[in-house]
């Protein structure tokens, strides 16, 4: 089963477009995990198990693990997701942007070491920075397009000679040239619903969108769903991280995360 097929199955089986982001910050962990050498793994595992009924995918951010020398805990976490929740794809958020053999090794890291089903990549160096990942025909390649951060406008909103903004040119290039085998998706932030709608119109219904920016970054659920959904009412992985992970710092942190995920899933479904 390819990444896209797995994602489509998860949308349908769980009736959900919610993606749970895994950005573990040990300073915000519950007290019961203090001093444990594998606290990052334990925290993320419990979050995964609590929120899996409401998720269509999980997105671990690699820097949150690497900064604590916890890549082995990321390996263990990905193995746990594949074993306990095999229907839910793992999107490794790494935003890699190199070329050639370096990119090939990044692909091996994501797809072999961690067993991710997809990963985020940066297209700034052109096709050379994306092509090595496309060689893994059953995996997904999620290309940065219109990111949720305000500074993204410094480059992404620049106009080409034909008047088209750069982010929309990237969307069209991925859809028309790089997605021949149906592996690609795009990252488009919830904080820019007009641009999100423009991207969906440009690429059509087939390509999934990873949509960060809901929750702590201020993206609006109604505007996001209306702008980004496809004709089937799916087509998106709407990501939330901190609002779910740290819904409570008390003893009820597992249930609080589950409740936050369920509530956001229901809010999304109330629109689509």
From Swiss-Prot:
Enzyme Commission no: 4.1.1.23
Source domain of life: Bacteria
GO MF: orotidine-5'-phosphate decarboxylase activity
Enzyme class: lyase
Signal peptide boundaries: none
Gene3D superfamilies hit by this protein: Aldolase class I (3.20.20.70)
UniProt-listed GO biological process terms: 'de novo' pyrimidine nucleobase biosynthetic process; 'de novo' UMP biosynthetic process
Keywords on record: Decarboxylase, Lyase, Pyrimidine biosynthesis
Keyword rRNA-binding: no
Active site location: 95 (proton donor)
Functional pathway: Pyrimidine metabolism; UMP biosynthesis via de novo pathway; UMP from orotate: step 2/2
Entries under Pfam families matching the protein: OMPdecase
Keyword Lyase: yes
SMART domains: OMPdecase (SM00934)
Enzymatic reactions: orotidine 5'-phosphate + H(+) = UMP + CO2
Family: Belongs to the OMP decarboxylase family. Type 2 subfamily.
Designated name of the protein: Orotidine 5'-phosphate decarboxylase
Species of origin: Bordetella petrii (strain ATCC BAA-461 / DSM 12804 / CCUG 43448)
The organism's taxonomic lineage, starting at the top: Bacteria, Pseudomonadati, Pseudomonadota, Betaproteobacteria, Burkholderiales
Gene: pyrF
